[in-house]
């Protein structure tokens, strides 16, 4: 099993939105960065666990846990001219972009703010806390995952 962190602006799609979806499951669409796409397409597997991270908001941070319940498949929003994620170079025959389905597991017991995560030496190598890393999807090591879960109770 792998661990991940996936970012979303809560004004676009929040942990509460995911919790309210039918079966608390939704596809994670709109990823338009090749490195993030490659991780989602090539490495994410059913059963992988994911931190849900709220970005571009008053208190950016980890707000919940999700699970990958369907491995990558073509992102249909890339084919829709009415979608903000439309890509004229992507087609059903030759898709350029992919998505996975994720399922809500739970909210974290408290928001784990980015500012707090940056203060922990044990997380200094985590892509999230390093300068210049703006990927919307990133791997989390098992040690980082377990450390962050322990922070919920502090």
Protein language model regions, located:
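Short, charged beta-turn/beta-strand-edge "cap" motif at the junction between a beta-strand
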Residues: 53-60
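Short glycine/proline-enriched turns and hinge-like loops at secondary-structure junctions
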Residues: 44, 60-62, 79
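Compositionally biased, charged N-terminal/linker segments
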Residues: 1-46, 144-145, 152-154
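A short secondary-structure junction signal
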Residues: 16-17, 78, 113-115, 148-151
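Aromatic- and Lys/Arg-enriched surface recognition patch
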Residues: 64-131, 135
């Amino acid at each position: 099993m792998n661990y991940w962190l996936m970012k979303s602006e809560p004004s676009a799609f929040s942990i509460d939105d995911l919790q309210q979806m039918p079966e608390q499951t939704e596809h994670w669409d709109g990823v338009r960065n090749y490195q993030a796409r490659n991780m989602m397409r090539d490495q994410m597997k059913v059963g992988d666990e994911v931190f849900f991270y709220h970005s571009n908001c008053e208190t950016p941070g980890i707000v919940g846990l999700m699970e990958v319940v369907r491995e990558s498949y073509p992102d249909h929003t890339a084919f829709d001219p009415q979608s903000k994620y439309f890509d004229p170079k992507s087609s059903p025959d030759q898709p350029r972009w992919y998505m996975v389905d994720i399922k809500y597991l739970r909210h974290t017991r408290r928001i784990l703010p980015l500012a707090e995560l940056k203060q922990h030496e044990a997380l200094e190598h985590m892509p999230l806390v390093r300068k210049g890393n703006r990927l919307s999807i990133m791997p989390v090591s098992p040690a980082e995952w377990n450390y962050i879960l322990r922070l919920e109770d502090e």
